[in-house]
Swiss-Prot record:
Family: Belongs to the thioredoxin family.
Subunit text: Homodimer; disulfide-linked. Interacts with TXNIP through the redox-active site. Interacts with MAP3K5 and CASP3. Interacts with APEX1; the interaction stimulates the FOS/JUN AP-1 DNA-binding activity in a redox-dependent manner.
Protein name: Thioredoxin
Keyword line: Acetylation, Activator, Cytoplasm, Disulfide bond, Electron transport, Nucleus, Redox-active center, S-nitrosylation, Secreted, Transcription, Transcription regulation, Transport
Active site: C32 (nucleophile), C35 (nucleophile)
Gene behind the chain: TXN
GO (cellular component) term, any one: cytoplasm
Record carries keyword Cell membrane: no
Organism per entry: Bos taurus (Bovine)
Amino acid sequence: MVKQIESKYAFQEALNSAGEKLVVVDFSATWCGPCKMIKPFFHSLSEKYSNVVFLEVDVDDCQDVAAECEVKCMPTFQFFKKGQKVGEFSGANKEKLEATINELI
């Protein structure tokens, strides 16, 4: 399941409540073509990796979160463990997304 983040508070809360689990954050926008293309794959990964927390941040709805995380383009995927960023890449690269998850869990 992918949790939609609506605020900076909800983002911090999700990172904190994840504990030891890997957190994967998809920063996207409704108008972004590549974001729309990879969204179903991101959701399928959330079903496949039940021990990983998947979050989705709409950069237009949560500009403060996107700014704090220094997101420059969409889609950007960031990876967190224990509240600390442990990885990041931009672009709708399915293989790299799944490979990075496998590397970090």
